[in-house]
Amino acid sequence: MKVLLTNDDGFHATGIKVLKEIIIESGIASEVWIAAPASNCSGYGRSIGVKTATDVYQIGDTEFIVNSTPSTSAFLGLREITGKKPDLVLSGINSGINVGNDIGYSGTIGAAAEGAMMNIPSIAISQEYDGKHGEINWINPQKFLKKIINMLLEVPFWNKSTIMNVNFPLVPAKGIKFTSQGEYIPSNKIEKKRNVSGSISYTVHRIAPDKGNRGYSDDSIKAIDDGYITITPLKLDMTDFDALESLIALYKDCTI
């Protein structure tokens, strides 16, 4: 099996190094390729560089640094860098979970979406991190990711245009739960600074609510808080079909 690894934390991030080690040691793939951004691109979502030249630096036989966004990195990795199309795309391991409404900002999800657009099984992988306990502990993905990947690849009804979004909790995992995305909404802190030039600089900080104060129901956020690994299927087609049917029914006689 040929696997493409990508991420949004950047080529030099620990998470993608851990992911590479897991895939090599597990024997899941015979070929492991990496195409990842030159620097941290968290929050870049699905932005892609078009009509601009993108520099790509080859580091090893199958490892490439892309001077662009996560989606551009995956796009070039899939269509140019790897040659023959990979059998699997793994995006991560992200430092911090990707759940709730924050998913729309996620470069980890955005990079995985490039694989899903080509009907390649694509998995986004994230590790919870609260910034309060020093180094990130990767023990959960190191213990369980191989099993999860093999399990998902055996799913007979997996529509390959669906991204599998996997999140690992901060604490030792109690098990796995299949969950919905949820409605997790962080608060924002905006720092404002006036520059000598006369311009104003704004720095946005996303602040996660304390556990127990997130306003969730039985979704991926609650499962993570309860110590479970979560797996959430995400569709590329964002159509609200209930609303679509209602609009068609409401305006069935609409004319212009």
Swiss-Prot record:
SUPFAM superfamilies this protein is in? SurE-like (SSF64167)
Reaction equations catalysed:
a ribonucleoside 5'-phosphate + H2O = a ribonucleoside + phosphate
Which cysteines share a disulfide bond?
Answer: none
Cofactor note (record)? Binds 1 divalent metal cation per subunit.
Which domain of life does the protein's organism represent?
Bacteria
Drop me one GO molecular function for this one: exopolyphosphatase activity
Q: What is its main location?
A: cytoplasm
Q: Where in the cell does this protein reside?
A: Cytoplasm
InterPro entries, alphabetized: SurE, SurE-like_Pase/nucleotidase, SurE-like_sf
User: Which terms in the GO cellular component ontology are assigned?
Assistant: cytoplasm
E.C. no: 3.1.3.5
Going by the record, the broad EC class of this enzyme is hydrolase
List of residues binding a divalent metal cation: D8, D9, S42, N94
Query: Cofactor(s) for this protein?
Result: a divalent metal cation
Query: Which keywords label this protein?
Result: Cytoplasm, Hydrolase, Metal-binding, Nucleotide-binding
The family database entries (PANTHER family) matched by this protein are listed as: 5'-NUCLEOTIDASE SURE, 5'_3'-NUCLEOTIDASE SURE
Q: Which family does it belong to?
A: Belongs to the SurE nucleotidase family.
Function field: Nucleotidase that shows phosphatase activity on nucleoside 5'-monophosphates.
HAMAP family (alphabetical): SurE
Its recorded name reads 5'-nucleotidase SurE
Per the UniProt record, the source organism is Ehrlichia canis (strain Jake)
